[in-house]
Amino acid sequence: MSKLTTGSFSIEDLESVQITINNIVGAAKEAAEEKAKELVKAGPTLFPGLESYRDDWNFKLLDRYEPVVTPMCDQCCYCTYGPCDLSGNKRGACGIDMMGHNGREFFLRVITGTACHAAHGRHLLDHLIETFGEDLPLNLGQSNVLTPNITISTGLSPKNLGEVKPAMEFVEEQLTQLLATVHAGQESAEIDYDSKALFSGSLDHVGMEISDVVQVAAYDFPKADPEAPLIEIGMGTIDKSKPFLCVIGHNVGGVTYMMDYMEENNLTDKMEIAGLCCTAIDLTRYKEADRRPPYAKVIGSMAKELKVIRSGMPDVIVVDEQCVRGDIVPEAQKLKIPVIASNAKIMFGLPNRTDADVNETIEELKSGAIPGCVMLDYEKLGELCIRLTMEMAPIRDASGITAIPTDEELANWVAKCADCGACLIACPEELDIPEAMGFAKEGDYSYLEGLHDICIGCRRCEQVCKKEIPILNIIEKVSQKQIAEEKGWMRAGRGQVSDAEIRAEGLNLVMGTTPGIIAIIGCPNYAEGTKDVYYIAEEFLKRNFIVVTTGCGAMDIGMFKDDDGKTLYERYPGGFQCGGLVNIGSCVSNAHITGAAEKVAAIFAQRTLEGNLAEIADYILNRVGACGLAWGAFSQKASSIGTGCNILGIPAVLGPHSSKYRRALIAKTYEEDKWKVYDARNGQEMPIPPAPEFLLTTAETWQEAIPMMAKACIRPSDNSMGRAIKLTHWMELHKKYLGGSEPEDWWKFVRNEADLPLANREALLKKLEAERGWEIDWKKKKIISGPKIKFDVSAQPTNLKRLCKEA
C-alpha cells in the first residue's frame, strides 16, 4: 500500500461522482475538547491525563490515607530476569522493590476492571448507534444533570448517543496510556502506581456511566423510578415444567433480541427466561419504564452458576461477558445443555455459526454434534436461542438428565468419604465439609444442608477429593427443599438518582441529619454466606440511612424474608430518601452511586462539575456522609469500582478475602498534623476529627463492618444535630455488635455538648469530665473546655489551598 501524503485534488472536471465522508478519526474528540475549552465555568482538568490529578488531589489523599501493602508472595515473575526475590527490602533485577511491585499488582487489577467496563460500554454504544442512530436522546428521567462522571472528566454533557462518543474515546485513550506503565522498566514508585490507580478508578466510573445511560435510553429501562417493578428472584422461582433458557453474564444486548422473539411469538408464558449475574438484573429492566408486568426472572449471583447447571434445569445456556465460569461448556456438556456464546470476549473454543443457517445450527446442537456455538448476529441469536430452548426441553425431559444423585447414590457417596480433610484445606471459605460428611454418615444431613448458602460453588473441593466424590452435587441434593423455597423479590434496577431527589436530600446529607448513604455492591465471595448483606442492609435501613444497592449485593439482599414473609424490597421504599432501599441496577449502574454524591455538590452546593474532579471530591470527602460495602468482592472490576469511589473521597469496606487485592488505604488517626484542612473563608488551617479514617479497608465479620461503616459516614462539616445523630448510631452499633462500652475514641468527634447523643448526654458529659479532664458547667450542662476542635457552623473545610478566598 502506498504511503498517504498531504496534498490536494480537484473534482471540478469529474462527473457522476459521489464522495462520502464517514467518521474522521479523532475528529469527534478534538471537536469535543474545543467545545469543552469554551465553557465559561470549568475546572482545571478537562480531559485529564495520567498526571492531571497527581499533585493537586491524589497525593493529598495518599498523604493522609497511606497505602498499606499486603503482598501475596515475595517474588516478582514479570520478566525473564526473574523470578526475583523481593523479601527483606531486596530489589529485583530491574530495580523494582516490593512496594513498587505490589503497587503495580494492585494497579493492574484496577485497570483490568476499568477496561472491562469500558469495553462493555464501547460494545453497547456501537451496537445501539448502529441500531437506533446517533440522535437517540438520553432520556434518563426527570433530571438535567444526566452524566456527572462524564462531565467531571471531559466537561461534556451529552444529550444523545452520538454525543457520548468523545467520552468513550477519551477513556480508551487513557487506558492505553495506563496499560503502558505496567511494562517492565516503566513506573516503579508505589505511590505513583496508587495515583494512577485512582485515576483509572475515575475512568471506570465514566465507562460504567456510558454503559448504563445508553442502555437505559435505548432499551427503555426504568428511568430514576422509585416504583420500579418487583422481580421474582431465586432458584425456586423457576417453573420446572416449562422450557428454561438461562442467560449468564453482564451485557444484556443480545438478550433483548431473545425477549423480543419471545414476545413476538407469544412465548412469554410458555417458557422461562432467567439469568445469573448482572445480565439477570438488566434483562428484568428491559422495557420496564412503563412498569409492565415482568416475566423475566433472576436466579442469583455467580456463586449459583455451577449449582444451576448441576441441577439440570436449564435447557439452553447463553453467555455474554464478565463473571462467567470457565468450565461452563464441559459442565453443561455432561448434561446435554447446549451453550451459546453471544459475545466475542468469551468464545470458549466453540465453532462459530454466526454466518450459518439457523435451522442447520439448531439441528447440530440438538443432535449433540457440537456442544455449543458462537453466535454474534443478534437477530439470529434471538431466534436460535428461543427455538432451541423449546426444542431441547422435551428431548432433555425424556432423558431425565440431572447431576443430582438419587437417595441411594447419595448414601454411597457419603460412605466413601475418608475424612482426609483435603476438601477443607482447598475450600476458599474453609467450610468444614468433613464434619458435615461425618454427620451424614450417621443419617444427619442438616450439616451438609447448612453449607448450601455459604458454598460459593467453586468445586475446588471436588478437584482434590481422592475418592472423586461430587461434593457440590451432594450439597445440592440434601438442599432440595431449601432450593425449592428459595423465592424472593428484588426491585428492578431503577437507574440514576434524580435531580429532584438530590434537592430533597442534599441538605440533610451535608448537615448530617440523614445519617449517611450506605452503598452495598459487588460480588458473592462472602465469608459466611449471602445473608450477611441482608443483615447489614436491614440494620442501616432501620436507622434511616439511605441504602443503595447494585449487582450481586442487590440480588442477595432480596433472597431473605422476615417473620411476615416480606423481603427488604417490600418493606422499604425505593426512593433516595431516609430509610430508602434503592436498587440502582447492575454493576455498570455503580456510576450512578458516585454520580449521586457528585450531584449533591453540583445541585445542592452549586459547584462546577466540568473538569473539576478535585473540588467535587474535596466537597464529598468533607461534607457527604457515604460509605461503600463490597462484602464479597472477588473481581478486578470490584477493585476498579472501589478505587473510583476512593478518588472521590468515598470510603469502602471490603470483606475478609479482599486483603488479596494487596492494598488498603488507612489513615493514622493519632497523627494530628494529617487531620487539618483549610477554612476556605480565609485560608487558615483548622483541625478536623479523624473522619473518615480510611478510604479502603477490610473487616473480618459483618458485625465488625457495621459500626465501622456507621463511623465512616461522619464528616467534618456535620452540624451539631447531624453529629449527634451519627454518634448515636455509631456508638449504639459498637455496643450492639462489638460489646462492652463506647468506642475508645468517641470523644474525638465531640466539638461541644450539642454534638453528644441526646439520650445519654449527661452520662457522656460525666465521662468526659472524669476520663478526659474536660471542664463542664453542670448548671448549664455545657462544655467549658476540652475539645481540640471548635464548632463553627459557617466554616468551609477544604483540602485545596487554591479554593481559599485569599488564594
UniProtKB/Swiss-Prot annotation:
CDD domains membership: ACS_1
Binding sites annotated in the UniProt record for [4Fe-4S] cluster 2: 76, 79, 84, 94
Positions of disulphide bridges: none
Residues reported in the UniProt entry to bind [Ni-4Fe-4S] cluster: 250, 278, 323, 523, 552, 587
InterPro entries assigned to the protein according to its UniProt record, in alphabetical order: 4Fe4S_Fe-S-bd, 4Fe4S_Fe_S_CS, CdhA, HCP/CODH, Prismane-like_a/b-sand, Prismane-like_sf
Pathway terms, separated by semicolons: One-carbon metabolism; methanogenesis from acetate
Pfam families in the cross-refs: Prismane
PROSITE patterns according to UniProt: 4FE4S_FER_1, 4FE4S_FER_2
Gene3D superfamilies associated with the record: 3.30.70.20, 3.40.50.2030, Carbon monoxide dehydrogenase alpha subunit. Chain M, domain 1 (1.10.8.190)
The protein's Enzyme Commission number: 1.2.7.4
Coiled coil regions, renumbered to chain: none
Matches recorded under SUPFAM superfamilies: alpha-helical ferredoxin (SSF46548), Prismane protein-like (SSF56821)
Binding-site residues, [4Fe-4S] cluster 4: 427, 455, 458, 461
Superkingdom field: Archaea
Cofactor annotation comment: Binds 7 [4Fe-4S] clusters per heterotetramer. Binds 2 [Ni-4Fe-4S] clusters per heterotetramer.
Binding residue positions for [4Fe-4S] cluster 1: 73, 77
Cofactor requirements of the protein: [4Fe-4S] cluster; [Ni-4Fe-4S] cluster
Notes concerning its domains: Cluster B is an all-cysteinyl-liganded 4Fe-4S cluster; cluster C is a mixed Ni-Fe-S cluster which is the active site of CO oxidation. Cluster D is also an all-cysteinyl-liganded 4Fe-4S cluster that bridges the two subunits of the CODH dimer. Contains two additional 4Fe-4S clusters, dubbed E and F, that probably transport electrons from ferredoxin to the B cluster.
HAMAP family per UniProt: CdhA (MF_01137)
Function, as annotated: Part of the ACDS complex that catalyzes the reversible cleavage of acetyl-CoA, allowing growth on acetate as sole source of carbon and energy. The alpha-epsilon subcomponent functions as a carbon monoxide dehydrogenase.
Family: Belongs to the Ni-containing carbon monoxide dehydrogenase family.
Name of the protein in question: Acetyl-CoA decarbonylase/synthase complex subunit alpha 2
Record organism: Methanosarcina mazei (strain ATCC BAA-159 / DSM 3647 / Goe1 / Go1 / JCM 11833 / OCM 88) (Methanosarcina frisia)
